[in-house]
Amino acid sequence: FTGIKGVGMTALALCAQDLGKKVSGSDTDEIFPTDKVLKQRKLKPKVGFKESNLPKKLDFLIHTGAHGGSTNLEVITAQKRGIPTLNLAQGLKLFTKDKQVIAVAGVGGKSTTSSMLAVLLDSAGLLPSFSVGVGSIKNLDAPGRFSKKSKFFVVEADEYVADPTADKTPRFHYLDPSIAILTNIEHDHPDVYPTIEDIFAAYKIFISNVPHNGAIIANIDNQGIKKFIKTIDKPVTTYGFSPQSDWQIT
């Protein structure tokens, strides 16, 4: 894992461990919120990015979009050796294959909502897999987990591009969610989305990946979402304080 200390990367590294894979990684020596959980899981990142960091036997390399993304020396070295390389979004797609994905998207509240969902499903005895962009989740003690016993996989779905250097695909376009939860939509990441209409277009593609027997759940209190759901042709279940919501918070 090149850039293993990033929150999304750590979550996937822990999923790989849960699958019984031998995991190694590299990153800078900066302090990260994932340092504690990596230490607990006996994952000691190598400092810096070097050819020698790559084990002789390597099934695949997953890399962050940071630290040069696909132009990182370790990624280039792996490719020269014929080792498959995946960016974080592609790696997440691999881990969520054959799972019932619950994807939480929005400009704000993604981490909190997906963490709450993971805790609730776990408390209900459903033992979900999850990948959330935080240092750790209270009561679960990790930002990521792969559960062979559960069909559910809770994912924080990010609208930013997968790899600024090589793959401008929004990360959440790689997902195939059974359930999509939209917390809010605002104009964000102007380097990628010049206008709010560009963001709406990205969310439309994300929503198009939800099957007709799936579910779209959205916060009707948010003006961006209120405008957005009028533009899609799939049923939406709404929640919020508004009397117009299907599930009203009182």
Q: Where on the chain are the PLM-derived regions?
A:
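Helix N-cap at the beta1-alpha1 junction of Rossmann-like dinucleotide-binding domains, i.e.
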Residues: 6, 28-32, 243
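N-terminal Rossmann-fold NAD(P) dinucleotide-binding loop
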Residues: 9
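NAD(P)-binding Rossmann-fold cofactor-contacting core
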Residues: 21-37, 128
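Short acidic-hydrophobic, aromatic-tinged amphipathic segments that line or gate anion-handling sites
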Residues: 45-49, 86
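BRCT (BRCA1 C-terminal) domain core and associated BRCT-interaction motifs
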Residues: 48-65
